[in-house]
Regions:
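A short, Lys/Arg-enriched amphipathic alpha-helix followed by its capping loop at the start of a domain
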Residues: 12-23
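Conserved small/polar residues in nucleotide/adenosyl-binding loops
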Residues: 1-5
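Rossmann-fold NAD(P)-binding glycine/threonine-rich loop
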Residues: 97
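S-adenosyl-L-methionine/SAH cofactor-binding core of RNA-modifying enzymes
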Residues: 25-26, 32-93
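Short conserved AdoMet
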Residues: 21, 57-58, 107
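Structured adenosyl-cofactor binding patch, chiefly the S-adenosyl-L-methionine
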Residues: 104-147
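Short N-terminal binding/cap micro-motifs at the start of the first secondary-structure element
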Residues: 6-11
Length: 148
């Protein structure tokens, strides 16, 4: 089974990724979700997905789960948070969970941030997150992209 984004998600994501330039590296990894089979409990699926996520993580990572219960913040606050993590030499790893979210254990080990109070399809959540990362970088670098 191949996991691919819709063409519009790839196009929009790539548009923002190319704007980052050489100062910031953005690495995207898509983890194949656990197979949803009749009789499997969601908790066991989420634990399997947690193991796959952790296996794909680099060292010295700050886990950030995008979650509906996470802290809401504006773009300026998000930029300050990214800047702080950079000063601490922590590479943030942003996680958008499967359709069932992420395991409670992974949530406990992570900073929880909210993209929106709306439920979003994964592709749109990905594009919004990448755009907000670019916006935060432009704020940090003093570029004119963000207007308060």
């Amino acid at each position: 089974m191949c996991i691919r984004d819709s063409p519009w998600v790839e196009d929009a994501s790539n548009e923002y990724i190319k704007r980052f330039g050489i100062d910031y590296a953005l690495v995207l990894k898509m983890i194949k979700p656990a197979k949803r089979k009749e009789g499997r409990k969601i908790a066991s699926l989420l634990i399997e997905e947690e193991q796959k996520i952790k296996a794909a993580l680099p060292h010295r990572t700050r886990l950030v789960v995008m979650d509906e219960t996470g802290r809401a913040m504006n773009s300026m606050a998000f930029a300050k948070l990214l800047q702080y993590w950079g000063q601490q030499s922590l590479d943030p790893c942003f996680i958008i969970g499967s359709a069932d979210g992420v395991s409670e254990n992974l949530k406990k080990q992570s900073t929880l941030l909210q993209l929106s109070e709306f439920s979003l399809p994964h592709g749109l959540a990905k594009v919004i997150l990448i755009e907000q990362l670019y916006r935060a970088v432009s704020i940090i670098k003093g570029l004119p992209y963000h207007r308060s």
